[in-house]
Curated annotation (Swiss-Prot):
GO terms for biological process: viral process. Belongs to the poxviridae C7 protein family. This is Probable host range protein 2-2. Plays a role for multiplication of the virus in different cell types. It comes from Rabbit fibroma virus (strain Kasza).
Length: 202
């Protein structure tokens, strides 16, 4: 079985902030760590999207793991679907003759609700291997002051996007759901060229 990519996206609904490509640059694992800094009780609504892509057959995803301050956090699987893409239309030259005929993708969408009342850590991950857990990116978020800080820890393609893109709302949200009225002019942070911590307002 050849897996080309396992990936994760996290959407913080009320914060209007998304974390894209939360998977390792090398290796079949995905995840991220959120450090939330608040001073009063807050309910944090999140959508978490996990995807696995293969060129040979549909590959099942392991269930999402989530923790809040070290304790298990409930996740609700709200949607799961498979897609198949015909790649033969791209095999138009000798350069592309080794391209596989089809690409298979499995997508799972989870709803996650966390009740927090102080500084808290939320972890999402697709494996329990210590080798991968130490390599996940860390994002510090202060919802009250509307700022976040990215700490790059191994995933060179991870991005934070705010506000959430309309294209993502249309893909993952039902009509009339909580993203209505949000614009599509995002501020995009790409941490691919830096290993330094960076502060951003949103």
């Amino acid at each position: 079985m050849t897996i080309t990519m396992i990936d994760m996206e996290v959407y913080l609904v009320d914060e209007n902030l998304s974390i894209k490509n939360a998977g390792l640059s090398h290796g079949y694992s995905c995840g991220c760590i959120l450090k939330l800094d608040i001073t009063s009780p807050k309910k944090v609504k999140m959508l978490v999207i996990t995807k696995v892509t293969s060129f040979q057959a549909i590959q099942e995803l392991k269930p999402l793991n989530a923790k809040l301050n070290g304790s298990d956090l409930d996740t609700e699987l709200v949607k799961c679907y498979n897609t198949t893409t015909d790649l033969t239309v791209y095999k138009t030259s000798a350069y592309h003759r080794d391209m596989p005929d089809k690409e298979y993708c499995v997508t799972r969408i989870y709803s996650v609700m966390a009740n927090i009342d102080s500084k808290s850590t939320i972890e999402f991950y697709g494996t329990t291997s210590d080798e991968f857990l130490s390599a996940y990116p860390v994002i510090y978020i202060n919802p009250e002051e509307k700022y976040y800080k990215v700490k790059n820890k191994g995933r060179l393609q991870m991005r934070v996007i705010t506000p959430i893109l309309n294209s993502d709302k249309l893909q993952f949200m039902a009509k009339g759901d909580m993203y209505a009225g949000v614009g599509d002019d995002p501020s995009i942070v790409d941490s691919s060229d830096s290993d330094e911590e960076t502060d951003y307002d949103y």
